[in-house]
Design a protein with these regions (language model features):
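Beta-propeller domains
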Residues: 33-62, 99-104
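Short, small-residue-biased leader/transition segments that mark boundaries at the very start
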Residues: 2-7
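Beta-strand-rich domains and repeat architectures in extracellular enzymes and scaffolds
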Residues: 13-36, 74-79
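Beta-sheet-dominated scaffold domains
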Residues: 37, 69-179
Length: 179
């Protein structure tokens, strides 16, 4: 959604014609996860989301953000959860952090970088445990419960398999994780 002038002069958002895997809300913007991209609307447009730039000549802090996950693996993004450092998003084999080093998140300052390469069960959303995030990995014979801590804009987070002591406790076909 956007004005006729903006739509005509703007590139189409990357989600057009593609499946949207998840809809989130992050920093006063509607966030869409589609393919390997995280697409954020213009801020404050939740009622009528606007994914088109204001001007093709300049970049504004209020422009939408459309950023792709750079990876050596196929990395379709299926889910995300807000943490202090930014928006942590999950593909089936990698996790990425959408963040900024600046105080304002805008198209010029947004970064989407890989923070870990742990398998993730795309059918069950990650959950917040306060200062950590837990999520399931069902890539083996049984599911594994992982906990991610100390996720920051720099460096790698600590990822611990907290179900390691009971490796056969969680069946592969779990369909719910809650805190």
């Amino acid at each position: 959604v956007g004005s006729e002038m903006c739509i005509r002069d703007s590139p189409m958002p990357t989600f057009v014609g593609k499946r949207i895997n998840k809809v989130l809300f992050f920093r006063n913007r509607l966030a869409l996860l589609s393919g390997e991209n995280v697409i954020l609307s213009r801020p404050g447009t939740l009622g009528t989301p606007d994914f088109f730039i204001e001007s093709a000549l300049t970049v504004s802090a209020s422009d939408p953000i459309d950023i792709s996950a750079a990876s050596m693996f196929p990395s379709d993004i299926f889910d995300g959860i807000e943490i202090n450092a930014g928006l942590l998003v999950f593909s089936t084999n990698q996790q990425f952090l959408l963040s900024t080093d600046d105080t304002v998140l805008n198209p010029d300052t947004a970064k989407l970088r890989s923070v870990s390469t742990v398998n993730y069960n795309k059918d069950i959303p990650p959950i917040s445990l306060g200062t950590t995030i837990s999520y399931l990995d069902n890539s083996g014979k049984f599911s594994r419960l992982n906990e991610m801590a100390n996720t920051s804009r720099e460096g790698e987070p600590d990822v611990v398999e907290i179900s390691k002591l009971v490796p056969t406790l969680l069946p592969k076909n779990l369909d719910l994780l809650t805190n």
